Amino acid sequence: MVLHQFDYLLAIGTIFAALDAWNIGANDVANSWATSVAARSVTYLQAMILGSIMEFAGSVGVGARVADTIRTKVVDTTLFADDPALLMLGMVCAVVASSIYLTMATRFGLPVSTTHSIMGGVIGMGIAAVGADGVQWVGSSINDGVVSVFLAWVIAPGLAGAFASIIFLVTKYGVLLRSNPVYKAFVMVPIYFGITAALLCMLLLWKGGSYKVTLTNPEIAGTIIGVGAAWALLVTIFLMPWLYRIVILEDWQLRFWHIPLGPLLLRRGEVPPPPADGSGVVQDFYAGRLTKEQLAARRAAQNGDSEMAAGAVTSSTSNPSAPTDGEKGATITKDDSSYSHDHSEPAQAAQPQIKTMVGPRPAGPWHSGAVLFWYVKWALFRGVDQDVLSSQQEKSVISSDVEELHAHATHYDNKTEYMYSFLQIMTAAAASFTHGANDIANAIGPYATVFQLWKDGALPEKGKADVPVWILVFGASCLVIGLWTYGYNIMRNLGNRITLQSPSRGFSMELGSAVTVILATRLKLPVSTTQCITGATVGVGLCSGTWRTINWRLVAWIYMGWFITLPVAGIISGCLMGIIINAPRWGYSG
């Protein structure tokens, strides 16, 4: 029996479920790609394209066809058996509260947990509707009940930071600080690719949305090992010859579409001289990032202390490979001579002119075709035109002195970093796919419950709500729009503002976060991908050997956002629910 008398609740739920999914794209997905963009492994536009494809494919392809009526299992839905429309109202209030809070958090650049946001909304409406006794504060297992939120504040960042630190330290002392690190990377990169593929296969097998495999444990182990070995072999055959031509021989004529040629690339002739205006085959991943000596020289020059500036420049240029913070083997890849006392402004690496997708507003009245088309482009592509990397260098209340922060971190060999950029792209894309497969339920799970209650007029059986494909497409589309239009706001507040990012660091962060999600999935521990990547970023930053490489003010700001997520969303939802169900009306005397 369709509850047509509550069509307005379905309409309101649809609007705010779209806003909730939009915020997941602008907040949750954006912080997943922040490290890759900050490390220059991908451009912002490339991150938007890859993120959109992987999130949409994960959501629609293997997204949950069946969602828990209340995903976080903090309110007993059987209490609403006699009044299913009241649960419908409660879920609408929860989605409204979650979307409002996420909008505020995204506006202020706070990376927050969307799972905890919707949980707060459900708790608030549950207290207002059935009282505090109807809320499951402590569950029968570690992943049930409200207490799981508090455990997640410690478990997620702690585990992710530990795993990411181990991965980066192995990379640091096994490759980056060794003599000839590029050749060491040629050995380690295929192994890392195989390990990463095996771990991501494990994640898909254990947390793969609606398509649950029915394999025995030995079959699962064999599949994981087989996928890892096969991927490592493919990388060795096809990618490594291409990287050899690019990194070692500096073949400036090669493009990414030459990768399928594999071993045939080794038979190419001598590399012709590059064009005079060429900027090199491998980009400088540390462009605009200063070492301590370079920063001291530039600031001394700005303060008029020419003697100190000259001394710092001489010290730095006389030993360009001198490690920072007492480390050995690290390579400084920038020319210090540009930081002489003759420069009163910061020396910046030459940046190519960025061609915007929106362009200037054409002349004419607002209702003309050209101007209206420009407004459409502005709405769709304004976010893509944002210069995220430059924004991360700007000072703000929470960004501290970013240049000083980066000066305490070591700069490793640039060509070696280039090889790790491909690993980082792989981990980010795969993490985005699994995020779409699972976390889209934060937005469409409650909405699917509202839709089924409206359609059937009764509680879903066994606390499960069917999720039609059109709802998955609806949620995934709103998520992608949020990523494209406002994802830059979270990205520019993260990445290099927490610690110095580079491909080797970013790969370690993302893989450490993925390992944490895999382990938590298997052990059913309550973790958030947002909290995992933040903990991994801090863990890798501390591997520089000093706490000064971390922007603790920003970390505290992020933690504050986690702390207030559940109570703020709960208060908004509870107030809405309480006001509505207790509101005076005609003929009501109670």
From Swiss-Prot:
User: What residues form the membrane-spanning segments?
Assistant: 6-26, 44-64, 85-105, 118-138, 149-169, 186-206, 220-240, 246-266, 467-487, 506-525, 527-547, 561-581
**Entry's InterPro entries?**
Phos_transporter
State what this protein does: High-affinity transporter for external inorganic phosphate. Acts probably as a sodium-phosphate symporter. Component of the high affinity phosphate transport system II (ptsII) necessary for scavenging phosphorus from the environment under conditions of limiting phosphorus.
Q: Which organism is it from?
A: Neurospora crassa (strain ATCC 24698 / 74-OR23-1A / CBS 708.71 / DSM 1257 / FGSC 987)
Q: Where in the cell is it found?
A: Cell membrane
Region feature (Disordered): 297-361
Cell membrane is among the record's keywords = yes
Spans of biased composition, class Basic and acidic residues?
Answer: 325-345
The annotated consequence of gene deletion is:
Impairs growth at low phosphate conditions when pho-5 is also absent. Prevents vanadate uptake.
Q: Which family does it belong to?
A: Belongs to the inorganic phosphate transporter (PiT) (TC 2.A.20) family.
Query: Could you tell me what induces this protein?
Result: Transcription is controlled by the phosphorus-acquisition regulatory system.
Q: Which keywords describe this protein according to UniProt?
A: Cell membrane, Membrane, Phosphate transport, Symport, Transmembrane, Transmembrane helix, Transport
- Name the gene behind this protein: pho-4
Q: Which GO terms are recorded in the biological process aspect for this UniProt protein? A: phosphate ion transmembrane transport
Drop me one GO molecular function for this one.
sodium:phosphate symporter activity
Q: Which residues lie on this side of the membrane: Cytoplasmic?
A: 267-466
* Main location per the UniProt record: membrane
* Composition bias type Polar residues, residue spans: 313-322
Describe how its activity is regulated: Phosphate transport activity is competitively inhibited by vanadate and arsenate.
Q: What is this protein called?
A: Phosphate-repressible phosphate permease pho-4
- According to its record, how does it sit in the membrane? Multi-pass membrane protein
Q: Which GO terms describe its cellular component?
A: plasma membrane
